[in-house]
Amino acid sequence: MPPANPRTKPKALNYALKFARGSLATIYDAEDWPAPDQLRVAAAALAANPELACVQAPLECYNGGDNWITRAFALEYAIHFHLWLPLLVRLGLPIPLGGTSNHFVVSKLRAAGAWDPFNVTEDADLGFRLAAQGWRCGMIAPPTLEEATTNRADWTRQRSRWIKGYMQTLLVRARPRETGAGAAGALSLCATLGAGVLSAFLYAPALALLAGWAIGAAAGVWPAPPLWAYALPLLVWAIAAASAIPAARRARAPALLRAALWQPIYWLFQTPAAAWALMQLIRRPHFWEKTEHGAADRRPR
């Protein structure tokens, strides 16, 4: 494509959309392994429901067993794509689309303005923008296999871009006229992107504060923390662990359940990624932090 800023994936997608001649369009990443019947199932779902502008296929990681990071990443995907997004769809709420395996009705995609070229999570933004136009996004069953990041450096680069994009989407979509779908759209926006960004910033500092408070109390420096201060993180961990059971079953990957044991440690990585995302939002808001691929120990069969 011709060189032009911003040099982002959505900018390239908008350029390619000009040449689309069909009634449907699908987005795949180069390293994806979609299920053989996914395109047919997506086309049938879109044809059967005129309210749908897009359907999202669940994303699963083919290298979830490489190491503890990939296993936690794969479990995170399983919960998101097999539990959380289907729940939002059943409730009739807008969903943040994933960055791949989106199947669109081209006329509705164009009517919504296609992708925001300045947003580095153009997929999440587009899900809410389609809802603002009165259309819905659905889920289909055939999955797409993709590669989980295999080390912390790659994970942080990818996650910081996601968090930066979520903040961009919140800054734009949180305006009253932009949320889409009224109170339902605002609820979904806050419960998905808003809660994710907030927890990324607060999780590690909150645990550090609680640990310092408990240590100081044990030394007699100050009173002990109230019981709810201990109960709250335990409740969050318990909910995540309980969610892992049906998510791993639906992803046909029972081995992912082990990752529930170290998810509380895995979540600590979110805070430095969030700090890096905030710095980039201020200094390099449209810079695309690329993710390295090809490091997986295994490939789909």
Kindly give the residue locations of the regions a language model identified.
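Long helical/loop segments within the catalytic core of UDP-sugar-dependent glycosyltransferases
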Residues: 2-23, 36-120, 160-171
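Membrane-proximal soluble regions of multi-pass membrane proteins
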Residues: 158, 162-170, 258-300
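Acidic donor-binding loop at a coil-to-helix junction in glycosyltransferase catalytic cores
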Residues: 120-126
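Catalytic donor-sugar/metal-binding loop of nucleotide-sugar-dependent glycosyltransferases
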Residues: 127-145
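The conserved acidic donor/metal-binding loop of glycosyltransferases
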Residues: 29-33, 115-118, 130
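Active-site-adjacent helix/loop segment of glycosyltransferases
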Residues: 150, 156-193
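Catalytic cores of eukaryotic secretory-pathway lumenal/extracellular enzymes that build
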Residues: 99, 138-139, 145-157
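Membrane-embedded multi-pass helical conduit in multi-pass membrane proteins
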Residues: 192-284
